Each structure stands twice: as C-alpha cells, then as structure tokens.
Amino acid sequence: MWTVPPLLIVLVAAAYPLLRVCLESTKVGDTQRGWSTWSEVLASPMFRDALWRTVSIAVTSTAGCLVLGMFLAIVLAFVPFPGSRVVGRLIDTVLALPSFLITLAFTFLYGSAGAVNAAISSLTGATSSALNFLYTPVGVIAAEITFFTPFVVRPLLASFAVLPRPQLDVAASLGASPLRVLRSIVMPEAWPALMAGGSLVLLLTLNEFGIVLFTGAKGVITLPVLIYTRGIVTFDLPGAAVIATVQIALSLMLYGLYRMVFARLMSGRGRGDADVVVEPAK
C-alpha cells in the first residue's frame, strides 16, 4: 500500500505530461488525429540537421568531459598540491550554477568584445576579433565541457575515495610505475563511476537548451532549440510535440542502453572480481 502514493505522484507529475505531449503530436487540425504531422516533421531537412547536430554535439561534449574529468579527478585525488581543496570546492560550486551563467562568462571572456580578444588586440594592434569560435558549434561544445565536467569529476572522486590506499602503496613498493598502478588498480574501480558520470553528461547535453540559446551560435539548431522555435515562436504545438516525442524516445533509449551496459559490467565484475596482483619490478 505504501508504494501506491509515490507511484501516483510519478504518474501525475511525469507520465501524464509526457503522454499528453505524445498525444499532441498526433493532432491534425482542431479535432482530428493522424500521422501527417509526423510525416511532415520527419521529412523536414531542418529536423534531420537538428537531430544530427544534437547527437554530434552531445557525443563530442561527453567525450571531452570524460577526458577532462578523468584528468582532474586523478590530479585532485592522487597528486596533492596547495589549493587542491579549494579547487574541489570550486568544482562543486559549478554544479549549483545554471548553465547560462557559463555561457555569459564565456561571452565576457571570448566574445567579440571580450577580455581575451581585447588583450590580443592591444598586443597585436588587430582591429578584428582574433577569436571567433564562441558563436560556432565549437563554442557550444567548449561551454558544455566547462559546465558538465564536474558531473564526471564528482563520481570519480567518490570512487577514488574508497580505494584501499594500502593496495596502492604495496603496488608502488613492488616497483609498479604510476601508469601501471593507474591501469591495473585505479581504472578497474573507476569504470562504474566513469560510466555513471558519462551517461549523465550525455543525457544532459542531449537535452541542453540554455547554453545553445545564450551563445546565439548561428546555424547551431538542436532539437531543444527546434522545439522552442516551433512551440513558442511559431506556435506550432503539434510539430513541437513530434520533435519532443523524438527527444523523449532518444533519451529513454540512451538511458536503457546505459542500464543494460552497466548491469553487464557489474555482473562481469562480480564473476571475475579478484585481488589485483602486481609483479615486482625486475
């Protein structure tokens, strides 16, 4: 009986609105229903371009977050330096900020009238902006990597915190190089956290709207931006609902794929879990 109230809350707060969106996508006119809106939207070159742009930006940003996040987490966890705790707190602070603030900061730094371009102009005497990447897909990807990397760093730091330090010390005392310790001991324990952070970043970048909108990047039309354009600007609610339904299906598919891969990874770890043996250096 205690499971009924939470289930009802989920159905009312999440499932019902999503169902209404899916039903709205089948509306034709005021009273009829059909699939003509689907055919029109899916055949549109703008939709196909937006779908490709959304997936490519999300995958590229996720890859960048994984590489940068792994590097930062390893440095913060295993390479002590003055101010490391402050850096960790700053990374946590980014998690509490809205995404458009990062874009605003990028505008002040790398925009056509930003601090970096002003400094370059003062040094070189150039009259045009030296950096123009902010208003391109590269600028969107850079802003997303900056904003979403902490979502990878935090799970990795939590995973590294529970690593048995004596095991690392023994491996080092036996002559294992830092790279071998990282590959043989650290990385196997970090895979679940890396997958969790990476899958979260992929879903977030796939549905990111604020960064793309605030950069004002020309030609960067993603699915969320296209939903906004058709639903709010042109007030084409059925067309926006079709794109939103595709977005929902894509997100659920990626989440299901993540759960399947994660379950197989954990079951494989359970079957083959054994102490790591590091041979002494010869």
Segments and roles (model prediction):
Residues 1-29, 45-161, 189, 193-209, ...:
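Membrane-water interface segments at the C-terminal ends of transmembrane alpha-helices
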Residues 27-31, 209-235:
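Glycine-rich helix-loop "coupling/hinge" segments at transmembrane-helix boundaries
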Residues 262-282:
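Short cytosolic juxtamembrane segments of multi-pass membrane proteins
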